[in-house]
């Protein structure tokens, strides 16, 4: 029934298996990828006819993580997979980027690739397996997929490169790098790094490139046995068409490219495009030329003009040399109500960035195959249509926005303080207000400025730069700080972010084959010099974090209590903690280990909440004096609330130094009296005395101690209760609280 074909290779100590012919047999290409306990199904479907009237490849990549793959049922009201998560979007883009440049340039058939995780093993990198599976499925399909791609993940642990590190190993790794490519070229790099040098990054890319070569071999073997006939493709456009357009319009196009303003240049190129289509309108109607052929020929002419100016004259369309950086302007604190803000402008690219502090309750909850976890740092990249002068409605975040935001997140994350140094959650919003190339790197620069102005103790300022490449044969030029047109017509988009010491993020997309490590080395060094120049300009405005937070920032502190006291603070059904929050206006977050984080809009509200928590968790010591409130009077004595929610009993003999006939003759409900704790009965109930209490040192204003460091003392039976639970506060915590509340400063 099944004609299954399987190829396998031992890769990094695990067997990687690719098979086809058993599952999804009606798809143009279908490959099952297995490694460890991970199983992915990758399919490729190609439309029979080309899509008319478009000038790009309509390729859609969908990566899906099925909940059942990890033995889970989806959360939420509807118990099924919903819209793609950010991770699914990011992996979809990761698959798309190395694959898209490898199709025949004239191919415009609708193409869909789906990669589904059916079984999940945390010991295997499923994103890498998805890239491999997608490439294999396309190699089996009729699509004119010209070369085969594979990928690998690289970590750096204890100075050694690690191939396909597990999630556990990545937590201790200085590098998380994905590299994809063909048998002779790197096509894509995506990484987060902890201040690594250019040499280390280049060696990591080489290591990853060499590591996936055995995988390319088995994909080729599978394709040789199971591939379907490829679609026959013609030239993108007739050579005669290009010659005719050049003859009629090349001078006008050259004049348009001589205009340094993006708006002016774009307007004139649009007018020329209209003229070209008007000239060929009869040819389009007679189907001599298609709309796509004319557009492609025109773009080829524009590309040739731009590339020739760079390679032959070392001159770019805005007049810069290949290494020049556009003019930079930085401004901080321009949004008075934000906790931190900055405006970063580089040429015609501009990013308005704001920073907001929140509580641990504001952290982003992420539900993934690995399990649920929280992100305390969030970065949202927004690219509104007005930034490129387009009249379009605002929509939900696009895949591009999610991807650019994650790249900026990777650049900033390594230099952030940990939660002990800075207990807030952090949200950065970067809105691209103008765009002409490298808006994601403008986001990195603006985010660094806004964070420092907000008072976040980052390790060092971070800047980012986008590099480009123009290559013809052996002749090439690496471009610093590329424009949008240079990105579109160029051969590489190479983004590098980092501090003065090293790289924190790197993303590279190459559109052609033959880009070797020599070119990458030149690009990395040129990017380093450009990054240092940008940092120099940024440092003129702000070079280190402000010592104080914004007056609009919330106050916060973190204390430690006995885990046994957690239930007392929460109360039945959350009654107690809800009452504290409502009366104080603060927010409280309690961890299972007894860590209590308190947040409020100002220090007065914070103090109210802390006092209420203190009253609940305090464990008084024998001999302490308190202001107590009489809650009930009996013939034998009285119950008195002496601290927090704790009541003690005063026997009639302890009410007064003189003999009294009745307790009610001395005490009434609601009376406030000084009481002294003299011990506990065999049930742990407090025993109090009023006699001579006002003659002893009053202890209500002393700093109570926490019950974190419990010790047991069996010297006296009456003290067993007290010795098992010391006071639930400590002076170290109080000293820290005083500093945090009054100074609101944080140090590394």
From Swiss-Prot:
Look up the record and give one Gene Ontology term from the biological process aspect: mRNA catabolic process
Location of this chain's protein in the cell: Cytoplasm
Q: Does the keyword Ribonucleoprotein apply?
A: no
Q: Give TM regions.
A: none
Q: Known SMART domains for this protein?
A: KH (SM00322), S1 (SM00316)
Q: Where does Mg(2+) bind?
A: 487, 493
Name used for this protein in its record: Polyribonucleotide nucleotidyltransferase
Gene symbol?
pnp
């Amino acid at each position: 029934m099944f004609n299954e074909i399987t190829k396998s290779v031992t890769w990094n100590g695990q067997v990687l298996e690719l098979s086809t012919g058993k599952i999804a047999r009606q798809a143009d290409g279908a490959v099952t990828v297995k490694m460890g306990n991970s199983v992915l199904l990758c399919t490729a479907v190609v439309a029979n006819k080309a899509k008319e009237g478009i000038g790009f490849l309509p390729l859609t990549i969908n990566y899906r993580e099925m909940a059942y793959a990890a033995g889970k049922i989806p959360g939420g009201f509807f118990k099924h997979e919903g819209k793609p998560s950010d991770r699914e979007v990011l992996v979809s883009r990761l698959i798309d980027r190395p694959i898209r440049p490898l199709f025949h340039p004239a191919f415009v058939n609708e193409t869909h690739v789906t990669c589904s995780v059916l079984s999940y093993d945390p010991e295997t990198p499923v994103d890498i397996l998805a890239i491999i599976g997608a490439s294999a499925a396309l190699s089996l399909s009729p699509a004119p997929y010209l070369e085969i791609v594979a990928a690998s993940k690289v970590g750096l642990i204890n100075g050694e490169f690690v191939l396909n590190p597990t999630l556990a190993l990545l937590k201790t790794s200085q590098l998380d790098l994905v590299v994809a490519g063909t048998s002779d070229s790197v096509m894509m790099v995506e990484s987060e790094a902890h201040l690594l040098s250019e040499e280390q990054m280049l060696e990591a890319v080489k290591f990853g490139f060499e590591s996936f070569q055995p995988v390319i071999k088995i994909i080729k073997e599978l394709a040789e046995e199971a591939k379907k006939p490829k679609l026959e493709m013609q030239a993108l456009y007739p050579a005669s068409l290009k010659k005719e357009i050049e003859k009629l319009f090349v001078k006008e196009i050259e004049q348009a490219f001589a205009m340094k303003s993006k708006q002016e240049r774009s307007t004139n190129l649009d007018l020329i495009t209209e003229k070209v289509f008007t000239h060929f309108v009869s040819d389009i109607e007679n189907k001599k030329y298609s709309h796509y052929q004319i557009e492609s020929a025109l773009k080829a002419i524009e590309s040739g003009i731009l590339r020739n100016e760079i390679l032959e004259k070392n001159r770019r369309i805005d007049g810069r040399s290949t290494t020049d950086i556009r003019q930079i302007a930085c401004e901080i604190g321009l949004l008075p109500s934000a906790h931190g803000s900055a405006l970063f402008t580089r040429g015609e690219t501009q990013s308005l960035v704001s920073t907001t502090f929140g509580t641990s309750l504001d952290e982003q909850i992420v539900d993934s195959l690995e399990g649920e976890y929280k992100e305390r740092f969030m970065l949202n990249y927004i690219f509104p249509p007005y930034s490129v002068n387009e009249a379009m409605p605002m929509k939900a975040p696009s895949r591009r926005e999610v991807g650019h935001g994650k790249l900026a997140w990777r650049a900033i994350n390594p230099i952030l303080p940990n939660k002990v140094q800075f207990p807030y959650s952090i949200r950065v919003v970067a809105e691209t207000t103008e765009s002409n190339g490298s808006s994601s790197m403008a986001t990195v620069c603006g985010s660094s400025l806004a964070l420092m102005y907000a008072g976040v103790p980052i390790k060092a300022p971070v800047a980012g730069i986008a590099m480009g490449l123009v290559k013809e044969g052996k002749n090439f030029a690496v471009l610093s700080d590329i424009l949008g047109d240079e990105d579109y017509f160029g051969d590489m988009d190479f983004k590098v972010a980092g501090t003065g010491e090293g790289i924190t993020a790197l993303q590279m997309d190459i559109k052609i084959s033959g880009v070797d490590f020599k070119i990458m080395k030149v690009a990395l060094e040129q990017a380093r010099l450009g990054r240092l120049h940008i940092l120099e300009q940024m440092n003129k405005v702000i070079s280190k974090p402000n010592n104080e937070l914004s007056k609009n920032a919330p106050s916060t502190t973190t204390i430690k209590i006995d885990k046994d006291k957690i239930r007392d603070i929460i109360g039945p059904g959350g009654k107690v903690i809800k009452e504290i929050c409502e009366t104080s206006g603060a927010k409280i977050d309690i961890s299972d280990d007894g860590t209590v984080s308190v947040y409020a809009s100002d220090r007065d509200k914070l103090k109210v909440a802390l006092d209420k928590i203190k009253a609940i968790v305090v464990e008084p010591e024998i001999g302490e004096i308190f202001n107590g409130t009489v809650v009930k009077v009996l013939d034998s004595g009285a119950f008195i609330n002496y601290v927090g929610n704790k009541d003690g009993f005063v026997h009639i003999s302890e009410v007064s130094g003189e003999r009294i006939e009745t307790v009610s003759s001395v005490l009434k409900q609601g009376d406030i009296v000084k009481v002294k704790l003299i011990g506990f009965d065999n049930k742990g109930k407090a025993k109090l005395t009023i006699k001579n209490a006002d003659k002893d040192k009053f202890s209500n204003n002393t700093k109570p101690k926490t019950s974190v460091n419990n010790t047991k003392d069996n010297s006296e039976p009456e003290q067993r209760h007290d010795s098992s639970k010391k006071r639930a506060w400590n002076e170290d915590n109080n000293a820290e609280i005083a500093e945090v509340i009054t100074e609101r400063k944080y140090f590394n």
